[in-house]
């Protein structure tokens, strides 16, 4: 089988989300760089893959997909028998759907701006906007309080097994180790910390992070 092609930038949270699931499945894929700084995502060749001009896009043979969460659902379903089962029958289907939605509507809207401010802007030669960081760090802390209460009763988001709901959060352990949005954002929440560390220890996550141009970690704890 020809390798799948994932179009995007390695540091994009949405690209990392898909790369993590591809690695969990043990699938052969290549990242085809799309340079947002030069407007490559708005050029006709990329718009043919995603008419909205956003990364990522995935090409799997004749199948062309965009929207990272839809891509991940496709991968988890089409390649269900390969690698990690991300939609296990033993997981609570209701919890899985709830936490997929939570990631999309509560977690990502606050975590993604932090990734941009704390990781992407410095790599592009800019400085983080302190006001934006503080705003989203405060909101993310409130979201993580909800996670802490839930994870006090569950090892993973949908129960005792790692699922697609957990995989969709993959960039954030990298964020908190490389540039924590505020001191103790994870360390002060022991159940979130244990969940974070379980994700970060997974070989698929480590393989994904190895391809991300992260800045060196700070000396203080997340």
Curated annotation (Swiss-Prot):
Residue ranges annotated for the GST N-terminal domain, each copy included: 2-83
Q: Does the keyword Transferase apply?
A: yes
Hydrolase found in the keyword field: no
Enzyme nomenclature, EC number: 2.5.1.18
Q: Which SUPFAM superfamilies match?
A: GST C-terminal domain-like, Thioredoxin-like
Arranged from A to Z, the UniProt key words for this protein are: Transferase
User: Its catalytic activity?
Assistant: RX + glutathione = an S-substituted glutathione + a halide anion + H(+)
Report the enzyme's class at the first EC level. transferase
Enumerate the residues binding glutathione.
Answer: 12-14, 41-42, 54-55, 67-68
Spell out the InterPro entries in the cross-references.
Answer: Glutathione-S-Trfase_C-like, Glutathione-S-Trfase_C_sf, Glutathione_S-Trfase_N, GST_C, GST_Phi_C, Thioredoxin-like_sf
Q: Which residues form the GST C-terminal domain?
A: 89-219
Cellular component terms, GO, for this chain's entry?
cytoplasm; protein-containing complex
GO BP terms, alphabetized:
glutathione metabolic process; response to herbicide
State the protein's purpose: Conjugation of reduced glutathione to a wide number of exogenous and endogenous hydrophobic electrophiles. Involved in the detoxification of certain herbicides.
Q: How does it assemble?
A: Homodimer.
Record family assignment: Belongs to the GST superfamily. Phi family.
| Protein name, as recorded | Glutathione S-transferase 3
- Organism equals Zea mays (Maize)
* Gene designation: GST3
